[in-house]
Amino acid sequence: MAARAAMLLGAERVVVIDRLPERLAMTATHVGAETLDYSSTDVGAELRELTGGRGPDVCIEAVGQESHTTGPAYLYDQVKQQLRLENDRPIAIREAIMACRKGGSVFSLGVFAGLVDKFPLGALMNKGLTLRGAQQHGQRYVPMLLERIARGEITTSHLATHVMSLDDGPHGYDLFKNKQDGCVRAVFQP
């Protein structure tokens, strides 16, 4: 949804980064954004290539404490969490700061619960980045969003990949948690 919002607000180019094939395909099909699979590419190098060496003007981190990666950074964060030295895995926000162009903006929309380690404050300062974080308090946007949905500018039906009864709730949560059967969102009906 952040990618679609960026496009509606006039972003010239939108690149979505993920590792799950079903989400990458959904993004390409329903949003029209370019996609990168971080498990098979050097995201920073790829973003520099796509932007003529500068990096993106704006980076949106939308996964928060649930971010994943491969390699030592992920292992480091997992160990710190097990030792209760940090609460979250700030991999995506770190990468957003490192990828963003000088003078750019980084927005953190993902949920974080507490402390993080290895936050690249030096890069944030030296690049002169603007960092904003927000939990969505969007009641004031509901009328505008409903108008855009009515005009067909925003569609959401593709997000509900698994519709099931409330009785199947535990199964739906398992599908979502374990990323099984292409589950992006389980929606429960009474």
Can you say where each PLM-predicted feature lies in the sequence?
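Glycine-rich phosphate-binding loop and adjacent beta-alpha segment
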Residues: 63-151, 158, 190
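C-terminal hydrophobic helical "lid"/dimerization subdomain
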Residues: 53-54, 94, 138-190
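Mid-domain Rossmann-like dinucleotide-binding core that forms the NAD(H)/NADP(H) cofactor-binding site
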Residues: 1-41, 45, 60
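Short conserved loop adjoining the S-adenosyl-L-methionine
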Residues: 43-49, 69
